[in-house]
């Protein structure tokens, strides 16, 4: 194999390694963002369930008073 071909191969391998490293970093960032978004969703779900519970309490309270003559 000529030196020129070897140099080209070496450059392509180096480019591939750099690309893989960048993709690994990007994947890690996306995993972190995914975790953050899941936590945010869980918080919204918890708050929404709290509000729905309050509405249910109001509805249950109204149901009792409307049935009483």
UniProtKB/Swiss-Prot annotation:
Keywords: Cell cycle, Cell division, Coiled coil, Cytoplasm, Septation
Any single GO BP term: division septum assembly
InterPro entries from the UniProt entry: Cell_div_ZapB
KW Coiled coil (keyword) present: yes
Domain of life of the native organism: Bacteria
Coiled-coil parts of chain: 3-60
Entry annotated with the keyword Cytoplasm: yes
Subcellular locations according to the entry: Cytoplasm
Cellular component terms per the entry's GO annotation: cytoplasm
Pfam families found in the cross-reference section: ZapB (PF06005)
Assembly information from the UniProt record: Homodimer. The ends of the coiled-coil dimer bind to each other, forming polymers. Interacts with FtsZ.
Reported function: Non-essential, abundant cell division factor that is required for proper Z-ring formation. It is recruited early to the divisome by direct interaction with FtsZ, stimulating Z-ring assembly and thereby promoting cell division earlier in the cell cycle. Its recruitment to the Z-ring requires functional FtsA or ZipA.
Family: Belongs to the ZapB family.
Protein known as: Cell division protein ZapB
The species this protein was found in: Chromohalobacter salexigens (strain ATCC BAA-138 / DSM 3043 / CIP 106854 / NCIMB 13768 / 1H11)
């Amino acid at each position: 194999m000529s030196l020129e071909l070897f140099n080209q191969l070496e450059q392509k391998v180096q480019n591939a390694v750099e690309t893989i490293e960048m993709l690994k970093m990007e994947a890690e960032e996306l995993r972190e963002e995914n975790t953050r978004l899941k936590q945010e969703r869980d918080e919204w779900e918890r708050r929404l369930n709290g509000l729905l519970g309050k509405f249910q309490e109001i509805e249950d309270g109204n149901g009792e008073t409307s049935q009483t003559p």
